Amino acid sequence: MALTKDDILNAIAEMPVMELVELIEAAEEKFGVDASAAVAVAAPAAGGEAAAEEKTEFDVVLKAAGANKVSAIKAVRGATGLGLKEAKAMVESAPVAVKEGVSKDEAEELKKQLEEAGAEVEVK
């Protein structure tokens, strides 16, 4: 009686990890292949696509001022250079974009500053 693919897969599924490693090594020797080479060749193609899709500009959105509105206003003023009246109007009109088209590092830093002031912030 010949083994089916399902029989082989079920047997492999029940094997401990160390036995699987030994099985892979034996298969590599028997058939003259290297399993890691196929993985290494496929990885850069996937990584290249991910890099092409990665965003480079981010928007920092103030979703809510939080419990301490005065601290949020001060943080917005410091980040944007707006006057007190403009910063207060921005905080009170949340959700609003505080800064648009900034780098990831700058967006994360601004988010951290606003959250420390008690504001609810999102980076898009």
From Swiss-Prot:
GO annotations of cellular component type: cytosolic large ribosomal subunit
Keywords associated with the record: Ribonucleoprotein, Ribosomal protein
GO molecular function: mRNA binding; structural constituent of ribosome
GO biological process: translation
Pfam families associated with the record: Ribosomal_L12, Ribosomal_L12_N
Similarity comment: Belongs to the bacterial ribosomal protein bL12 family.
Chain's role: Forms part of the ribosomal stalk which helps the ribosome interact with GTP-bound translation factors. Is thus essential for accurate translation.
UniProt cross-references to PANTHER family, sorted A to Z: 39S RIBOSOMAL PROTEIN L12, LARGE RIBOSOMAL SUBUNIT PROTEIN BL12M
Subunit structure, as described in the record: Homodimer. Part of the ribosomal stalk of the 50S ribosomal subunit. Forms a multimeric L10(L12)X complex, where L10 forms an elongated spine to which 2 to 4 L12 dimers bind in a sequential fashion. Binds GTP-bound translation factors.
The protein's name: Large ribosomal subunit protein bL12
Organism: Idiomarina loihiensis (strain ATCC BAA-735 / DSM 15497 / L2-TR)
Gene (name only): rplL
